[in-house]
A protein has these predicted regions:
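Catalytic-core regions built around general acid/base machinery
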Residues: 1-4
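Acidic beta-strand-to-loop metal/phosphate-binding motif
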Residues: 6-14
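Conserved "right-hand" nucleotidyltransferase catalytic core of DNA-directed polymerases
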Residues: 14, 29, 45, 53, ...
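Phosphate- and divalent-cation-binding pockets in alpha/beta enzyme and binding domains
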Residues: 16-23, 180
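Alpha-helical scaffold elements adjacent to nucleotide-binding pockets in ATP/GTP-utilizing enzyme cores
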Residues: 17-20, 49-53
C-alpha cells in the first residue's frame, strides 16, 4: 500500500517518516506534507509544527510528547510508553494530520500557491531525506588535530594573560575576568549588571583592547575556545559510528526567506 503510486500518503513533516521507514525497506510514492502546505500558505506568519497548526486551525491542543516520555536525563524512549497511551498518541497524530490536509489542500488552490508547493517545496522532501540518510563525510583525524592545535594556542594565551594579570584565574569566567580588569588592574569603563558582576562582553573587551594587551588576548582566547567547543569538538560527537558521517537535518519550513536551515548539528554556520 505504501509504495502504491495510486495511494496518497499524507504526513506532517513526512521527511522524518520517510527516513525511518527506509531503514525497513519501505518507501512512499505519492506524498503530501501538511507542514509544507502550511509553509507555502503562511510562510513567515507563524510556526508550522503540528501543535501550532492544530491549535490555530483546529482549536485543539494535542497530547505533548514530553508528557509521555519526559525530558532531560529522565526521559524514556517511546518503546517504553504504555501501549494504550502510545496508541492514543499515534491515533491523534494521524487524525490531526488528515484534518489539516483536508483544510489546506483546497486553500493551496484558492491562494494560487499549488505550483509553489508541488514544484518547489514537496519535491525537496525526497532529495533532502536522501541527503540526510547519506550524511556528510567528516575527517575525524583532522578535527582532532585542529582541536589539539586550538588547545595549545589557548594554553599559550592563558600564560600570557596570567603574566599580564599578575595571577592565575579562570579566563573563561566573566566574573573573575571582570574582577581582574576593573578591580585589580583598575581599567576604566567597568559597569556592573543586575547580578553585581562586571560586564565583560565582546563590546567591552573590544573597547579596552584599543589600550591594553590583556583584553586583546582574552578576545583571541574566546575565539579559539568558540571554535574548539562549538565546531571541532562538537562535530566529533555528531559523527555516526556506523556510517562515519555527520547526519544533519535540513529544515524546509524554517526561515522566512525560503532558504534551507540545518539543525542537529547546524552545518550552515561553520567558519571556513
Amino acid at each position: 500500500v505504501l509504495s502504491d503510486p495510486a495511494v496518497l500518503i499524507v504526513g506532517q513533516n513526512i521527511k522524518y517518516d520517510i527516513k525511518i521507514l527506509s531503514k525497513y525497506g519501505l518507501a512512499f510514492e505519492a506524498i503530501d506534507d501538511t507542514m509544507l502546505m502550511s509553509y507555502a500558505l503562511h510562510g513567515g506568519i507563524h510556526r508550522h509544527s503540528m501543535d501550532t497548526l492544530s491549535e490555530k486551525y483546529l482549536g485543539h491542543t494535542p497530547v505533548s510528547i514530553k508528557s509521555l516520555i519526559g525530558t532531560g536525563k529522565s526521559a524514556i524512549t517511546f518503546d517504553f510508553v504504555p501501549i494504550d497511551e502510545a496508541s492514543n498518541y499515534a491515533a491523534e497524530d494521524a487524525d490531526i494530520t488528515i484534518r489539516l490536509w483536508k483544510l489546506f489542500k483546497p486553500k493551496l488552490h484558492l491562494s494560487k500557491v499549488t505550483k509553489v508547493y508541488e514544484t518547489l517545496e514537496r519535491p525537496l522532501v525526497r532529495v533532502l531525506s536522501d541527503m540526510e540518510l547519506l550524511g556528510i563525510k567528516v575527517d575525524r583525524d583532522t578535527l582532532v588535530r585542529m582541536s589539539n592545535s586550538f588547545s595549545q594556542k589557548m594554553a599559550h594565551l592563558e600564560e600570557e594573560i596570567y603574566s599580564l594579570a599578575g595571577e592565575k584565574f579562570n579566563v573563561g569566567s566573566p566574573k573573575q575576568l571582570g574582577e581582574i580588569l576593573f578591580d585589580k588592574l583598575g581599567y576604566a569603563g567597568g559597569a556592573k549588571g543586575k547580578t553585581g558582576a562586571y560586564s565583560t562582553g565582546a563590546d567591552v573587551l573590544a573597547d579596552l583592547a584599543t589600550e591594553y594587551d590583556l583584553p586583546s588576548k582574552v578576545i583571541d582566547w574566546r575565539q579559539l575556545s568558540k571554535l574548539k567547543s562549538t565546531y571541532t569538538d562538537a562535530l566529533q560527537d555528531h559523527i555516526n559510528p556506523a556510517s562515519g558521517r555527520v547526519h544533519t537535518s535540513y529544515v524546509i519550513a524554517g526561515a522566512n526567506t525560503g532558504r534551507l536551515a540545518s539543525a542537529d548539528p547546524n552545518l550552515q554556520n561553520i567558519p571556513c
